[in-house]
């Protein structure tokens, strides 16, 4: 077997397996019982699409596809961060939200180490 034949066979198997994974991930997105399940499915879908693009780039020899895969990875990451912020903001109780803003409230600052030492010594 020549190296070209091995590469062709390996890329064919990879395309079949990635296509199957893509199909199963789409089913998980559709049937996902909760919103975080769907967000995780979308993130996995982006990762599988990046793999498909990379295999197609190797198979065709048109390596500009790798740049497209990198851009898709960046967009997928930003989408995941946006969905996470949406889920976090949606889960806050109404009294913790600041009316008229989309900012997520920050936690209260903890006392400094110096303040703790003073309290320990005072006991």
Swiss-Prot record:
The keyword Kinase does not apply. Coiled coil: none annotated. Signal peptide: none annotated. Residues 95-123 are annotated as: Disordered. InterPro entries: MrpF/PhaF-like. Pfam families: MrpF_PhaF. It is a multi-pass membrane protein. Keywords: Cell membrane, Membrane, Transmembrane, Transmembrane helix, Transport. One of its GO terms (molecular function) is sodium:proton antiporter activity. The keyword Mitochondrion does not apply. Belongs to the CPA3 antiporters (TC 2.A.63) subunit F family. It comes from the Bacteria. It is found in: Cell membrane. This is PhaF2 protein. The chain crosses the membrane at residues 4-24, 38-58, 64-84. One of its GO terms (cellular component) is plasma membrane.
């Amino acid at each position: 077997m020549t190296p070209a034949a091995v590469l062709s066979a390996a890329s064919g198997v990879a395309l079949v397996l990635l296509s199957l994974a893509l199909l199963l991930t789409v089913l998980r997105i559709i049937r996902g019982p909760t919103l975080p399940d769907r967000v995780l499915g979308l993130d996995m879908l982006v990762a599988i699409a990046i793999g498909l693009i990379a295999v197609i780039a190797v198979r065709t020899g048109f390596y500009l596809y790798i740049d497209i895969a990198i851009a898709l990875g960046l967009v997928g990451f930003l989408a995941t961060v946006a969905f996470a912020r949406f889920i976090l903001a949606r889960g806050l109780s109404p009294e913790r939200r600041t009316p008229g803003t989309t900012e997520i409230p920050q936690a209260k600052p903890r006392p400094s180490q110096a303040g703790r030492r003073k309290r320990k010594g005072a006991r």
